[in-house]
């Protein structure tokens, strides 16, 4: 907020460690929210256009992180092979979807929880890992086995196999308030106007009054476009065999977009209904 004093040391650390931009803004101006929304739109190639609808009177600053990813499949799906097929939603209903189709060699593994296929992008620096639950389990039952140790083990088990992959086109636009999740994970004081301690940031009595993430993921024959914006608001008191293996994604599944050299996860989600 224009005129609100933040310690230079806090600004310097954010510029140095996160290449953060710092901008003063008149929060009382009716166009202030438009400035913030425009920045988010520019950073996400217009995938996410509105993250702020109004600025409360007690808001003092917004800490906003934006992530944009566009990956072209190393082996693209041919649009001529896309057919209308059924996808069974988690509630048992069936929905006609545009089902993409290709037969190619991909990394593959199978265990008691999932059949797993890894579809690389471009030069293979990034990939999408598809997790299709075992036929005798629901997606949530299989996801209960997704621990850090199992994730590492499953990735190590991946090896090249010829797969016939059927994958629906899908687009996800989703936003979620994160405060309850952070509190459940043990981060409580930061959201309490009487207990929060941001004294290394400012002399004002600050607390986090807003923590919200906006996500956009679009998967089609060409590849994947994905973006995420996390908004934190600081308020003042008064986060192969010869026969191809069938990998048909025709029921609820999970996906992970990762950077391969480090294993860093950029996006992850689950699709339960199309």
Where are the regions that the model predicts?
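Non-catalytic, conformational "gating/processing" segments within enzyme and secreted inhibitor domains
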Residues: 1-134, 156-239
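Extended hydrophobic
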Residues: 63, 115-131, 240-274
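Composition- and surface-driven signal marking solvent-exposed, interaction-prone regions
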Residues: 76-78, 131, 141-146, 231-232, ...
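Short, charged/polar low-complexity linear motifs in solvent-exposed/disordered segments
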Residues: 82, 145-146, 244
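Internal alpha/beta scaffold segment
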Residues: 133-159
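Extracytoplasmic/secreted cell-surface and envelope-processing proteins
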Residues: 138-140, 174-176, 227, 264-267
């Amino acid at each position: 907020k224009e005129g609100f004093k933040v310690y230079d040391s806090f600004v310097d650390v954010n510029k140095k460690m996160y290449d953060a931009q710092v901008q003063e803004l008149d929060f009382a101006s009716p166009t202030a929210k438009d400035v913030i929304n425009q920045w988010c739109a520019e950073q996400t190639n217009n995938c996410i256009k509105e993250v702020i609808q109004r600025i409360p009177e007690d808001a003092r600053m917004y800490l906003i992180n934006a992530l944009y990813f566009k990956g072209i499949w190393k082996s693209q799906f041919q649009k001529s092979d896309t057919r209308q097929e059924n996808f069974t939603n988690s509630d048992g209903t069936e929905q006609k979807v545009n089902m993409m189709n290709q037969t190619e060699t991909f990394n593959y593994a199978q265990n008691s929880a999932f059949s797993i296929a890894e579809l690389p992008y471009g030069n293979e620096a990034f990939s999408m890992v598809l997790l299709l639950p075992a036929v005798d389990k629901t997606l949530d039952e299989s996801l209960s086995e997704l621990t850090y140790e199992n994730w590492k083990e499953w990735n190590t088990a991946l090896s090249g196999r010829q797969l016939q992959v059927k994958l629906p086109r899908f687009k996800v636009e989703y936003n979620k308030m994160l405060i309850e999740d952070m509190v459940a994970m043990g981060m409580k004081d930061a959201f309490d106007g009487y207990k929060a301690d941001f004294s290394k940031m400012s002399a004002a009595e600050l607390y986090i009054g807003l923590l919200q993430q906006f996500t956009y993921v679009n998967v089609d024959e060409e590849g994947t476009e994905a973006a995420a914006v996390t908004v934190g608001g600081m308020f003042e008191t008064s986060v192969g065999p010869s026969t191809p293996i069938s990998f048909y994604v025709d029921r609820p599944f999970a996906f992970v977009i990762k950077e391969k050299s480090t294993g860093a996860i950029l996006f992850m989600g689950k699709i339960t209904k199309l």
